[in-house]
């Protein structure tokens, strides 16, 4: 089983600027595109907001997960015609493969979400397959954030200012 976890890039901005009716229309068009990308036996779901998931049972006649993810990203990036406007959106996709990553559905969803986060931090409009090093990266980031919060609470930071000097007049700007 392969799980594709899909999140639209910048959807909140679209909703905020063009309104929820436009956002809802885009979501309906997106759902239709995802159904067309889906293979026989796939389940397409919308867990909430602008997130979608596709559960793909790997069959001998299936396309490769890489080919499916590529098709998803390309299909989602095609323009949407809504209310006389032509809108362009992109998506980030996280992919978790059961045989490689785990067998438990909750863990697969977590892994796909971690991979989705990596796709977003790597520049969006992309897909990433989960690998265990992603967990290490997230743990290191959490450790750093915790250390900074603790250092702030203990007053361990000192601020030093470097003046900006005008070289001609030798005066501080």
Functional labels for PLM-detected ranges:
Residues 1-2, 9-39, 45-49, 53-54, ...:
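Conserved long alpha-helical elements within nucleotide-processing catalytic cores of c-di-GMP signaling
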Residues 3-5, 129:
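Core hydrophobic beta-sheet residues of small sensory/regulatory alpha/beta domains
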Residues 5, 56, 95-97, 161:
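Sensory input modules used in signal transduction
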Residues 35, 120, 149-153:
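Short regulatory alpha-helical segment in sensory/regulatory domains of signaling proteins that mediates
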Residues 44, 71, 75-81, 85, ...:
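Cyclic nucleotide signaling catalytic output domains
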Residues 54, 89-91:
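HATPase_c (GHKL) ATP-binding subdomain of two-component histidine kinases
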Residues 140-173:
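Active-site core of bacterial EAL-family cyclic-dinucleotide phosphodiesterase domains
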């Amino acid at each position: 089983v392969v799980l594709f976890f899909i999140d639209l890039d910048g959807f909140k901005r679209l909703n905020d600027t063009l309104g929820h009716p436009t956002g809802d229309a885009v979501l309906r068009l997106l759902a239709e595109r995802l159904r067309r990308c889906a293979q026989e036996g796939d389940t397409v779901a919308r867990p909430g907001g602008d997130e979608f998931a596709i559960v793909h049972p790997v069959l001998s006649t299936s396309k490769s997960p890489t080919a499916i993810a590529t098709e998803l990203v390309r299909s989602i990036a095609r323009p949407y015609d809504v209310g006389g406007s032509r809108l362009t959106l992109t998506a980030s996709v996280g992919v978790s493969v059961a045989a490689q990553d785990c067998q438990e559905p909750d863990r697969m969803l977590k892994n796909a979400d971690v991979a989705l986060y990596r796709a977003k931090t790597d520049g969006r409009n992309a897909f990433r397959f989960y690998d265990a090093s992603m967990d290490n990266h997230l743990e290191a980031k959490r450790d750093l954030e915790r250390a900074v919060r603790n250092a702030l609470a203990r007053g361990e930071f000192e601020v030093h200012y470097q003046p900006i000097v005008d070289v001609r007049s030798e005066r501080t700007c």
